[in-house]
């Protein structure tokens, strides 16, 4: 295997980190222990998979000499074992190639999820609410926490806009390919002629930035407070608990009124603002990359039409990878694994292809 030397080094590093986690000096230092545990965790899958490969390789090394045996029964046993182990070895090597791909540094981050109704009027707001419900259900299946920071309802009970913080394990890794335009094709409840209409919403998934990555300077922000309001604009309380933060250098504005506490609303608004500023920096970096590299990592362009939900045909189609599922009812209930897994595998294959063109992993 071309990259066995690389894997030997990573396995050795994994063992070193495992030993450090048992070191009393490391255990007594919470920050240091957290860093070591994180580094060890990042290598655990690779180390386990490499050991699995070595076990298979040992089995093959023992079976191959038996092909020279005069005993027909022993020879047949060796042939059967090799026939079983060779495909297993190839499968593990493919999995190792995926594990060795450069990691997206944002994959472990929480996200800011933004959904906005686009073309289609009231129907678009109803669809925005349904898509938000879809993601909420999916978050439940993943044991993620979803917190709404702000939302704007339409007169028909839909959502003009909703912004939420999603926290948990590998949130960005699983939701990062959701950014873009989502179209719905169906007969609206207000349609008298039974004609199918097309409406659209936009989804943005931003990796959440922490205070170290994006520092908010007091001189750069203006904070306004106001009374929270419900649907139709009516006041829902008499205290100035809602918060609006304006980032003066960029003009970005973030509001939060979901909590009754002004302090909690401000904290949530700051999390969203940091993530938007982080996204601006990521966009600058993306612009500096070549077009081919941007394709490999997935553009995340909000104007890109990525998916169509056709209700009459119970069909959902992802246009980027040519995926069509006639299980729209399941998907809308938050059963998104088939789509998420297919997108992940597609972009992993793209990266593997790019890696192969560069040459073997050193």
Curated annotation (Swiss-Prot):
Instruction: List modified residues, type N5-methylglutamine.
Output: 234
Q: Which UniProt keywords apply?
A: Cytoplasm, Methylation, Protein biosynthesis
The terms under GO molecular function for this entry are: translation release factor activity, codon specific
- Which superkingdom heads the taxonomic lineage of this protein's source? Bacteria
Entry annotated with the keyword Disulfide bond: no
* UniProt modification remark: Methylated by PrmC. Methylation increases the termination efficiency of RF1.
Please state which protein family the record places this protein in.
Belongs to the prokaryotic/mitochondrial release factor family.
User: Its function?
Assistant: Peptide chain release factor 1 directs the termination of translation in response to the peptide chain termination codons UAG and UAA.
* Protein's recorded name: Peptide chain release factor 1
Source organism of the structure: Solibacter usitatus (strain Ellin6076)
Q: Which gene underlies this protein?
A: prfA
